[in-house]
UniProtKB/Swiss-Prot annotation:
Protein name per its UniProtKB record: ATP synthase subunit a
Gene name as annotated: atpB
NCBIfam families: ATP_synt_6_or_A
Keyword Transmembrane helix: yes
Molecular function per GO: proton-transporting ATP synthase activity, rotational mechanism
Localisation: Cell inner membrane
Provenance organism: Koribacter versatilis (strain Ellin345)
Keywords: ATP synthesis, Cell inner membrane, Cell membrane, CF(0), Hydrogen ion transport, Ion transport, Membrane, Transmembrane, Transmembrane helix, Transport
Length: 245
C-alpha cells in the first residue's frame, strides 16, 4: 500500500471499488486495487473542485457597481492573459483566451497547493506536466488545422524553399514532438526541485526561516506558469498564422 495523503485516503475509501472496476474494464494496470487513486490524481481533483468553487463564488458575486475581491482577481487574470494573447497571437486571440486562462490558473493552483501542509504539488509528478503538455499540443494543432485547412497547415512544415522541403518537414515534425518533452520537463523539473528544497530547509533550519524559501517557491511557481502559458500562446500563434498561404 503506497503512502497516501489524507485526501487521497478519503477518495480511495469511497471510490476505490468503482475506479478499480473501470481500470479493469479499460485494461489499465492497477497494482493497488484498494488504493487505485494516487496522490497526484487526488491533488488534481482537489484543485479542480477548489477552482470550481472559486468561479461559482465569483459568478454569484459579480457586480458592475461594487466588484468584490474574487471578481477583481478573476478579471485581473483574464485581462493579463488577454493582453499577452493580443501581443503574441494578434487578430482572433479572443478565441483562445479562455483556454490559456484556464490552463494558467490550473497549473498555478497545482504548483501552489504543495505549500499547504498535508498536500503535494501534482506538477512535481511527471504525469501531470505531461498531460498539460499533451493537451496544449493537440489544442494548437487542432486550431492550426481549423484556421488553415490541411494543405495550408502542412505548408507550415515545409518552408519557403521547395527543394529542401522534405528535410525541413522531418525537422519540423521532430521539433513539434520535442515541444511535448520541453514543456513537460521544464515544469516538472522546476517544481520537483522546488518541493525538495523547501522540504529540506523545513527539516534542517529553525521554524520561521523556511518562509523565505516558501516565497522562493511561490516565485518559481508563478514564473513556471507564465512560461508555460506563454509558450502555449506562441505555439498557437505559429499554428494559426496564415503567413505561408
Amino acid at each position: 500500500m503506497p503512502h497516501q495523503l489524507w485526501f487521497t485516503a478519503f477518495l480511495n475509501q469511497y471510490l476505490a471499488g468503482p475506479v478499480s472496476a473501470m481500470m479493469s474494464v479499460l485494461h489499465v494496470p492497477n497494482p493497488h486495487p484498494r488504493a487505485p487513486i494516487s496522490n497526484y490524481v487526488a491533488m488534481e481533483i482537489l484543485v479542480f473542485l477548489l477552482l470550481v468553487l472559486f468561479f461559482i463564488a465569483t459568478r454569484i458575486s459579480l457586480s458592475w457597481d461594487k466588484p468584490g475581491v474574487l471578481q477583481h482577481i478573476a478579471e485581473g487574470m483574464n485581462n493579463f492573459v488577454s493582453n499577452q494573447g493580443e501581443e503574441m497571437i494578434g487578430h482572433g486571440y479572443e478565441t483562445y483566451t479562455s483556454y490559456i486562462v484556464t490552463l494558467g490558473v490550473f497549473i498555478l493552483s497545482m504548483n501552489l497547493i504543495g505549500l499547504i501542509p498535508g498536500f503535494e504539488a501534482p506538477t512535481a509528478f511527471p504525469s501531470v506536466p505531461l498531460g498539460c503538455a499533451l493537451v496544449t499540443w493537440f489544442f494548437y494543432h487542432v486550431h492550426g488545422l481549423r484556421e488553415n485547412g490541411v494543405i495550408g497547415y502542412l505548408k507550415h512544415f515545409l518552408g519557403p524553399v521547395w527543394w529542401i522541403s522534405p528535410l525541413l518537414f522531418v525537422i519540423e515534425i521532430c521539433s513539434h514532438f520535442a515541444r511535448i518533452m520541453s514543456l513537460t520537463i521544464r515544469l516538472y523539473a522546476n517544481m520537483f526541485a522546488g518541493d525538495m528544497v523547501t522540504l529540506a530547509f523545513f527539516s534542517l533550519v529553525p521554524l520561521g526561516f523556511p518562509v523565505v524559501f516558501m516565497g522562493l517557491h511561490i516565485f518559481v511557481s508563478l514564473i513556471q506558469t507564465y512560461i508555460f502559458i506563454t509558450l502555449a500562446a506562441v505555439y498557437l500563434a505559429e499554428a494559426t498564422a496564415h503567413g505561408h498561404d
